[in-house]
């Protein structure tokens, strides 16, 4: 059994280099919610050094609230913004001798695209226009995954180790107090259930089917690094190979 382990990088956390030694894919902030040309270049260099798959992490234009502000933008505007961000990272990756392999939207862009087919189509078409070989990463079972499939892209369905799920398969909003799983043991148990049994227990107790191609871990704080190490160890014990797909 194989699974990808991904993390968001270039967002101002001090643990990026250490985290890159634990994951198989990196989603690099492209400047709209965090990061700049220098952080993008450094993240790309580290990813190449550690053999980690490089991906773009585009966002709504929202540096003030870290890309977590809901926005109602015309699809053509979102299309242009995503193309702009992918182009910036692709140029840096090319200059450093690497290959950009995937795209994972950030924050509210990701969450809204999970539910809004028009927004999801705009993102998928932008990815296809930049490079149809790029993989599109989205919430498992979401509109973004369906949009990627309609566009003829290879999609990767994502699950979250430390986020609680609702009965419809969406994430519990961060604005709610139980959105995050604080217990490492519970997060590990949830992740193994998603990867091995293709199901996740929602907060109402129901079991929801889910496809886990890639698992997201968050990298802010020393605790996050310890959890990522525990997750890698758990995968090894269960004979699950961590690799970009």
Swiss-Prot record:
Q: Could you say which EC number(s) this protein's record lists?
A: 3.5.2.9
Q: Which InterPro entries match?
A: Glyco_hydro/deAcase_b/a-brl, LamB/YcsF/PxpA-like
Note the coiled coil stretches, chain numbering. none
The question of whether Hydrolase is a record keyword is answered with yes
Q: Name one Pfam family in it.
A: LamB_YcsF
Instruction: For this entry, list what GO says about its biological process.
Output: carbohydrate metabolic process
**Can you state which reaction this protein catalyses?**
5-oxo-L-proline + ATP + 2 H2O = L-glutamate + ADP + phosphate + H(+)
**Molecular function GO terms recorded:** 5-oxoprolinase (ATP-hydrolyzing) activity; ATP binding
| Keywords attached to this entry | ATP-binding, Hydrolase, Nucleotide-binding
Q: Which family does it belong to?
A: Belongs to the LamB/PxpA family.
Oligomeric form and interacting partners: Forms a complex composed of PxpA, PxpB and PxpC.
Protein name per Swiss-Prot or TrEMBL: 5-oxoprolinase subunit A
Q: Which organism is it from?
A: Yersinia enterocolitica serotype O:8 / biotype 1B (strain NCTC 13174 / 8081)
